[in-house]
Amino acid sequence: MVTLNHYLILSSLLFMIGLVGVMRRKNLLMLFFSTEIMLNAVNVGLVAAGKYMNDMAGQMFSFFIIAVAASEVAVGLGLLILWYKKNGSLDLDNLQLMKG
């Protein structure tokens, strides 16, 4: 049987994978994807905790996070596309060019 510990271990592993991706990648798109992995890891933890506590709050918070992540995807990908069209690269080191 799958217990709460299994879900929390999965959630923490996913979060660590996303955190390593955020710290090690220089491509803005990969940073964006790593952030999404971290948000989904939090969702797994919230849903699992809500299931084992017989409380719907975890699922409700998870739906709220999904809604926020969807708007983040819409705005973030739009900005990344514009950045790529302007500079031809999504390298994080080129972000210094935005200084006034």
Swiss-Prot record:
Domain of life per record: Bacteria
Main location class: membrane
Keyword Membrane attached: yes
Transmembrane residue ranges: 2-22, 28-48, 63-83
Subcellular localization, as worded in the UniProt entry: Cell inner membrane
UniProt family annotation: Belongs to the complex I subunit 4L family.
HAMAP family on file: NDH1_NuoK
Biological role: NDH-1 shuttles electrons from NADH, via FMN and iron-sulfur (Fe-S) centers, to quinones in the respiratory chain. The immediate electron acceptor for the enzyme in this species is believed to be ubiquinone. Couples the redox reaction to proton translocation (for every two electrons transferred, four hydrogen ions are translocated across the cytoplasmic membrane), and thus conserves the redox energy in a proton gradient.
Quaternary state and interactors: NDH-1 is composed of 14 different subunits. Subunits NuoA, H, J, K, L, M, N constitute the membrane sector of the complex.
Name of this protein: NADH-quinone oxidoreductase subunit K
Organism annotation: Wolinella succinogenes (strain ATCC 29543 / DSM 1740 / CCUG 13145 / JCM 31913 / LMG 7466 / NCTC 11488 / FDC 602W)
